[in-house]
């Protein structure tokens, strides 16, 4: 009987133990039912991840700056191509037109009248009384001016206003080539500059190949008698013109542009006279005025009427049209000499 009681107690204990274990195993099942979906379920509902794309490389802006050295030896740097320019000298203005860069001109010196289209551009006071305020008001990127027309103070004032100043100073034919090259570099017209120079050189080379014979002399009259006689001496492009033609400049012994006297001209007795005096339609022409001067009647050029008036500054403006002036003078001398040979003896 005692044995049966013991078995009953053991059986009850096993049942309690079994019930307790089953309660413990149900709890995790209930918990997993309320948990968030498994990672696999999450990836099924997420948006697909985008593939990372490297940003496109950014190009550095092209460097368009450039530096030139003007005819005074100054280095001038431009940070961009020239869009607005002012030219004070007639030669520089002519060069800009010849280069095909006239659309950049927003101002010119009052004596810049060639080509005729230049007169349509607003003018500013230039020379010894250059009007800096007028120039600044035009807001140019660059100002071209001659050595004789600028001072250190003017340059400083212009550069302070953000205007680059480029100085040209052609005193001979090589200097003209340098001016054309310089302005071509500034305006981005290098090829055009080379073409202009080549064309001029072709004219000069042809004349040099057929020099005038007989050691004839020429007198260049830059300023007429009423204003005081001036001529072109050694170191000027007009003296070079005489030499390339085979002529002798009567005043090759003076330096540069020089004031002379009537007596000196009469004494040197030139075979040819070239005057650059402008004729305004009133009074005697420059040729007639020279022919009528008292005491000049025995000068060979006057007796033979070998006087040429070049009215468009072809020989005084150091630009591309100098070649035209040289050709005109050469043709005049050749034709005059031919006429003299054909003329009957007196």
Residue ranges with predicted function:
Residues 84-138, 142-148:
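A short, structured surface patch at a secondary-structure boundary
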Residues 5-7, 19-91, 190-219, 272, ...:
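Bacterial Sec-exported substrate-binding components of ABC uptake systems
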Residues 177-178, 185, 194, 205, ...:
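Structured C-terminal subdomain patch of bacterial secreted/periplasmic proteins
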Residues 151-154, 166-182, 215-237, 281-284:
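Extracytoplasmic ligand-binding site segments that recognize negatively charged/polar headgroups
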């Amino acid at each position: 009987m005692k044995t049966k009681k013991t078995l009953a107690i053991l059986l009850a204990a096993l049942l309690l133990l079994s019930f307790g274990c089953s309660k413990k195993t149900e709890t995790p099942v209930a918990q997993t039912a309320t948990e968030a979906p498994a990672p696999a379920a999450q990836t099924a509902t997420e948006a697909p991840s985008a593939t990372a794309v490297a940003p496109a490389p950014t190009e550095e802006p092209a460097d368009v700056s450039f530096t030139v050295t003007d005819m005074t030896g100054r280095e001038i740097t431009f940070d961009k191509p020239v869009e607005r320019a002012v030219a004070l000298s007639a030669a520089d203005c002519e060069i800009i037109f010849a280069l095909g860069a006239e659309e950049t001109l927003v101002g010119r010196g009052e004596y810049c009248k060639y080509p005729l289209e230049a007169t349509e551009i607003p003018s500013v006071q230039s020379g010894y009384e250059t009007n800096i305020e007028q120039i600044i008001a035009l807001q140019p990127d660059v100002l071209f001016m001659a050595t004789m027309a600028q001072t250190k103070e003017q340059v400083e004032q212009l550069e302070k206003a953000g205007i680059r100043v480029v100085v040209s100073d052609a005193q001979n034919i090589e200097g003209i080539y340098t001016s054309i090259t310089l302005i071509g570099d500034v305006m981005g017209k290098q090829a055009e500059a080379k073409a202009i120079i080549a064309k001029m050189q072709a004219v000069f080379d042809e004349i040099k190949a057929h020099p005038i014979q007989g050691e004839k002399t020429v007198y260049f009259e830059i300023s007429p008698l009423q204003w005081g006689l001036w001529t072109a001496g050694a170191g000027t492009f007009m003296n070079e013109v005489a030499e390339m033609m085979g002529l002798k400049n009567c005043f090759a012994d003076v330096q540069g542009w020089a004031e002379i006297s009537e007596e000196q001209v009469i004494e040197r007795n030139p075979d040819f006279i070239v005057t650059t005096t402008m004729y305004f339609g009133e009074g005697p022409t420059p040729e007639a005025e020279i022919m009528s001067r008292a005491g000049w009647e025995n000068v060979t050029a006057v007796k033979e009427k070998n006087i040429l008036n070049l009215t468009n500054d072809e020989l005084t403006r150091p630009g591309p049209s100098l070649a035209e002036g040289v050709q005109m003078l050469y043709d005049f001398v050749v034709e005059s000499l031919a006429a003299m040979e054909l003329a009957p003896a007196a």
